[in-house]
UniProtKB/Swiss-Prot annotation:
Keywords: Capsid protein, Cytoplasmic inwards viral transport, Host nucleus, Host-virus interaction, Late protein, Microtubular inwards viral transport, T=25 icosahedral capsid protein, Virion, Virus entry into host cell. The lineage of its organism: Viruses, Varidnaviria, Bamfordvirae, Preplasmiviricota, Tectiliviricetes. InterPro entries: Adenovirus_Pll_hexon_N, Adenovirus_Pll_hexon_sub2, VP_dsDNA_II. Induction: Expressed in the late phase of the viral replicative cycle. Belongs to the adenoviridae hexon protein family. This is Hexon protein.
C-alpha cells in the first residue's frame, strides 16, 4: 500500500530476467569436442535466468518443501505438536518482521516477492488491492472451479554451498512469489532508465514523486448570497427580518453553511458560546479541515537506505531433488533457472532513527485522528492488561492500527474520514465548542451533559448545534 516513508527510489521486492554469461565459453572447448557441444555452449550463453532482489523479514523455525514453519500446534488443541507452515495466500506478511533490534540471527527466513511478470515500480506510491479476506494481494485465477492466487515458493541457500553443490544443501530463505494488481494512483515516475516497460536490473533505480493536487472550486457556495438576501440564508423567521409575513424556504445545506461561516467570520457570536452554555459548531474550518489539537510526541522516526533494503546477502536458488518423492528427508540441489547471485536481505530493513515531513504529517494524523477514533477500531497492545471498562483512560488510549493513518494521503485536498463526521467522540475533539467545554470540565472524553439552548434562539438552534 501507499507508503510515504519509503525512499523515493526504493524498489519493491521483485524479480527480472537477464541474459546470463555462460560458465563455459565455446572458444575454450577442446578441439576434440563436437559441434553439438559448441552449439549447446552458445545456447547456454544466451540463456535467460531469473534474478532476485528482495527482503525476507520473517524469521521461522525451519524450511522444508512445504515452506517456512512459523509455529507448532498448541498442546490444548487437536493435532498437538503438528508443524504449522505459513499460509502462502497471505503469509509471510510483508509488514511483519523482527519485533526488536537485538533478536538472534535468523537461520530460516521468509518473505514475499513480486514475480517477473508484475511490472517493476518504486515502492513509494505502489498500491496493490487485497484479493482475499486475510489481506493477501495475489492475482486470482480460476483453478478447479474456484478463484485462487498462484503463489509459488522459491528456495535459496547460501551462494557458495549451492553453486558448488556440496552435500547437505539446506535452504535458508524461502520467498513466496506472486503477481499482484500493481497501481500507482498517487505518484508518477520522476526517473526511469531507458528500458521500456520490461523488468530489468536498471529498473531497480526508478524514482517516483507525488502527483500535483488539482484543486476544484465550489461554484455553489454563495449562490443566493451574491445576488440577494432572501432572509432564508439567515435561518430566522421570515417576519422578523423583512417585516412581511411571508415564508421563504431555506437554501440548500451547502449555501446555508457558507452563509453561516461568513456570519461567523464577521461577527463574534462564537466568542460567547460559553455564556449561553452552548457548543457552537465550527462548521468547515475546525470540523472539515484538520487542525492540530493533539500531542506530537507519539512515534519514533526512522530513515532508510536508498535501496529500501540495505545490507543483503548473496543467495543461489535451490530445488528439491525429484528422485526423493515424499519418502524420507528432502534433499536439495542447485536450481539453474535462477542466476547465481540473488541479493536478499534477511530480517528487518536496515534503518536509523527520521522523511521528516512525512513523519510530522503522520504524527499529526495519529495524534489528531487515530487517538480519537471509536474504541472498536482500537486494540490492546501485546502483553498489556487493559481495563474492559470503556470509560477508563487506559481503555480509551488503546493503540490504533497504523494503516488507519497511513492510508490518509495529503495531496493538498481538504477532506475528512467518515469517522470525523459521524462518530461522537471524534466530533467532540474536532468541534471548537465541545473542545472548550471539555477544557472546562476536565480532560475527559466521557462527560454526560445536556446542551442547553436559550429559547430566544429556538428558530436557529439546529444551525448552532
Amino acid at each position: 500500500a501507499y507508503n510515504a516513508l519509503a525512499p523515493k527510489g526504493a524498489p519493491n521486492s521483485c524479480e527480472w530476467e537477464q541474459n546470463e554469461t555462460a560458465q563455459v565459453d565455446a572458444q575454450e572447448l577442446d578441439e576434440e569436442e563436437n559441434e553439438a557441444n559448441e552449439a549447446q555452449a552458445r545456447e547456454q550463453e544466451q540463456a535467460k535466468k531469473t534474478h532476485v532482489y528482495a527482503q525476507a523479514p520473517l524469521s521461522g523455525i525451519k524450511i522444508t518443501k512445504e515452506g517456512l514453519q512459523i509455529g507448532t500446534a498448541d498442546a490444548t488443541v487437536a493435532g498437538a505438536g503438528k508443524e504449522i507452515f505459513a499460509d502462502k495466500t497471505f503469509q509471510p506478511e510483508p509488514q511483519v518482521g523482527e519485533s526488536q533490534w537485538n533478536e538472534a540471527d535468523a537461520t530460516a527466513a521468509g518473505g514475499r516477492v513480486l514475480k517477473k511478470t508484475t511490472p517493476m515500480k518504486p515502492c513509494y506510491g505502489s498500491y496493490a488491492r487485497p484479493t482475499n479476506s486475510n489481506g493477501g494481494q495475489g492475482v486470482l485465477w480460476l483453478t478447479n472451479g474456484k478463484l485462487e492466487s498462484q503463489v509459488e515458493m522459491q528456495f535459496f541457500s547460501t551462494s557458495t554451498n549451492a553453486t558448488n553443490e556440496v552435500n547437505n544443501i539446506q535452504p535458508t530463505v524461502v520467498l513466496y512469489s506472486e503477481d499482484v494488481n500493481m497501481e500507482t494512483p498517487d505518484t508518477h515516475l520522476s526517473y526511469k532508465p531507458k528500458m521500456g516497460d520490461k523488468n530489468a536490473k536498471v529498473s531497480l533505480g526508478q524514482q517516483a514523486m507525488p502527483n500535483r493536487p488539482n484543486y476544484i472550486a465550489f461554484r455553489d457556495n454563495f449562490i443566493g448570497l451574491m445576488y440577494y438576501n432572501s432572509t432564508g440564508n439567515m435561518g430566522v423567521l421570515a417576519g422578523q427580518a423583512s417585516q412581511l409575513n411571508a415564508v421563504v424556504d431555506l437554501q440548500d445545506r451547502n449555501t446555508e453553511l457558507s452563509y453561516q461561516l461568513l456570519l461567523d467570520s464577521i461577527g463574534d457570536r462564537t466568542r460567547y458560546f460559553s455564556m449561553w452554555n452552548q457548543a457552537v459548531d465550527s462548521y468547515d474550518p475546525d470540523v472539515r479541515i484538520i487542525e492540530n489539537h493533539g500531542t506530537e510526541d507519539e512515534l519514533p522516526n526512522y530513515c532508510f537506505p536508498l535501496g529500501g533494503i540495505g545490507i543483503t546477502d548473496t543467495f543461489q536458488a535451490v530445488k528439491t531433488t525429484a528422485a526423493n518423492g515424499d519418502q524420507g528427508n528432502t534433499t536439495w540441489q542447485k536450481d539453474s533457472t535462477f542466476a547465481e547471485r540473488n541479493e536478499i536481505g534477511v530480517g528487518n530493513n536496515f534503518a536509523m532513527e527520521i522523511n521528516l515531513n512525512a513523519n510530522l504529517w503522520r504524527n499529526f494524523l495519529y495524534s489528531n485522528i487515530a487517538l480519537y477514533l471509536p474504541d472498536k477500531l482500537k486494540y490492546n497492545p501485546t502483553n498489556v492488561d487493559i481495563s474492559d471498562n470503556p470509560n477508563t483512560y487506559d481503555h480509551m488510549k488503546r493503540v490504533v492500527a497504523p494503516g488507519l493513518v497511513d492510508c490518509y494521503i495529503n495531496l493538498g485536498a481538504r477532506w475528512s474520514l467518515d469517522y470525523m463526521d459521524n462518530v461522537n467522540p471524534f466530533n467532540h475533539h474536532r468541534n471548537a465548542g465541545l473542545r472548550y467545554r471539555s477544557m472546562l470540565l476536565g480532560n475527559g472524553r466521557y462527560v454526560p451533559f445536556h446542551i442547553q439552548v436559550p429559547q430566544k434562539f429556538f428558530a436557529i438552534k439546529n444551525l448552532l448545534l
